[in-house]
Amino acid sequence: MTMENQSIVQRALAGLIETGDVDALAPFLSDDFVHHRPGATTSTKVEWLAAVRAALVPLAGMQVEIHQVLTDGDHVVMYSRRWLPDAGPEIAVVDIWRIDDGLIAEAWEIIEPVAQVTANLAWWV
């Protein structure tokens, strides 16, 4: 089941990342889908898809480099780096997806500008 859950997330994101097709993402989300992000309100399926559509214009051309996709039971975790060619900072993103009955039921997203990582981890060294 773990690899099946990973495949669900990868197929859901493929159309969005490769072509910007938000409508291709919708069938992979449960009707009760909830999106969580620190410092932001929780979004329903309809609200989140609308936010993704609105973000596509300013984020057109965004490059996404997926570094890790890990699965544990009904959760899939993806670490990626994203950037806009010739604009804005590169960001590191961790997405956590919870799968329920073959659909994405919940998502969490942590975003950090890569340039801030060194400053934020100064205590680590």
Regions found by a protein language model. Name each.
Residues 57-58, 84-90:
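Short, cysteine-centered beta-strand-loop-beta hairpins and adjacent loop/turn segments enriched
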Residues 9, 24-25, 33, 48, ...:
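Hydrophobic pocket/interface hotspot
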Residues 2-31:
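Short acidic-aromatic low-complexity motifs
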Residues 109-125:
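Low-complexity, intrinsically disordered terminal/linker segments enriched in charged
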Residues 29, 82-84, 110-111:
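Short beta-strand segments enriched in hydrophobic/aromatic residues
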Residues 22-73:
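A solvent-exposed, acidic/Ser-Thr-rich amphipathic alpha-helical stretch
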Residues 85-87, 100-102, 112-114:
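Short coil/turn motifs at secondary-structure junctions
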Residues 52, 64-70, 81-83, 92-98:
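Hydrophobic/aromatic beta-strand elements that line small-molecule binding cavities or substrate pockets
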